[in-house]
């Protein structure tokens, strides 16, 4: 029998009695966001909406985005990345478990000096893939042109965010490149590796 989303007590300022809310609702109130699934339209819109809402509520307090994602669709991932650059608060990105494909792209998009990986996290980068291998030739050619533009966009962002030269990023994106937290730090995708009991939550 599925447990469902756990609920925790929450007391609003000025209220005596606590109400039970789902744990993610409670964490969102502390400006903690989660990308814990494949990147697709619905979760992308939720994260973007939360970032915008929390920025309107208080544009001086940092946001924290925890990532454990196998990747997913390119456009929803780019939407999250663009929103992170757009909102006034700094967005910390924290990799726990795996940040692969668009997950690593979002991870790299955090505020520089505020991108972190847990010690046993894994990061993977590669080029965007087509979903139209069995499409008619004309559609495939159009798709290939769009993929090339997306690859150029993703490559330029990695160059900007990691400080690596274009040729290094381009070469790495030719295949699946898996990295440990230490390797991701050396590659410029994250800035810090979490050490037990030394990281302060908001």
From Swiss-Prot:
Keywords: Chloroplast, Hydrolase, Plastid, Protease, Serine protease. Disulfide bonds: none annotated. One of its GO terms (molecular function) is ATP-dependent peptidase activity. GO terms for biological process: protein quality control for misfolded or incompletely synthesized proteins. It is an enzyme of class 3 (hydrolase). It catalyses: Hydrolysis of proteins to small peptides in the presence of ATP and magnesium. alpha-casein is the usual test substrate. In the absence of ATP, only oligopeptides shorter than five residues are hydrolyzed (such as succinyl-Leu-Tyr-|-NHMec, and Leu-Tyr-Leu-|-Tyr-Trp, in which cleavage of the -Tyr-|-Leu- and -Tyr-|-Trp bonds also occurs). The keyword Protease applies. Pfam families: CLP_protease (PF00574). CDD domains: S14_ClpP_2 (cd07017). This is ATP-dependent Clp protease proteolytic subunit. It comes from Amborella trichopoda. The lineage of its organism: Eukaryota, Viridiplantae, Streptophyta, Embryophyta, Tracheophyta. The gene is clpP.
């Amino acid at each position: 029998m599925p447990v469902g989303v756990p609920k925790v007590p929450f007391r609003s300022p000025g209220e005596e009695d606590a109400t039970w809310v789902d744990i993610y609702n409670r964490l969102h109130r502390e400006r903690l966001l989660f990308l814990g699934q494949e990147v697709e339209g619905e979760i992308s819109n939720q994260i973007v909406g939360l970032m915008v809402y929390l920025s309107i509520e208080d544009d001086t307090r940092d946001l924290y985005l925890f990532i454990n994602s196998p990747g997913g669709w390119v456009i929803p991932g780019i939407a999250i990345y663009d929103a992170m650059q757009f909102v006034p608060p700094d967005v910390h990105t924290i990799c726990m478990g795996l940040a692969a494909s668009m997950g690593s792209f979002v991870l790299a998009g955090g505020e520089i000096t505020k991108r972190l990986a847990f010690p046993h996290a894994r990061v993977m980068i590669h080029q965007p893939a087509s979903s139209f291998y069995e499409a008619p030739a004309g559609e495939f050619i159009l798709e290939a042109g769009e993929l090339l533009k997306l690859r150029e966009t993703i490559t330029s962002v990695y160059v900007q965010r990691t400080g690596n030269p274009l040729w290094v990023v381009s070469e790495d994106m030719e295949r699946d490149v898996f990295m440990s937290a230490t390797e991701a730090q050396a590659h410029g995708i994250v800035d810090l590796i979490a050490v037990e009991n030394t990281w302060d939550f908001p």
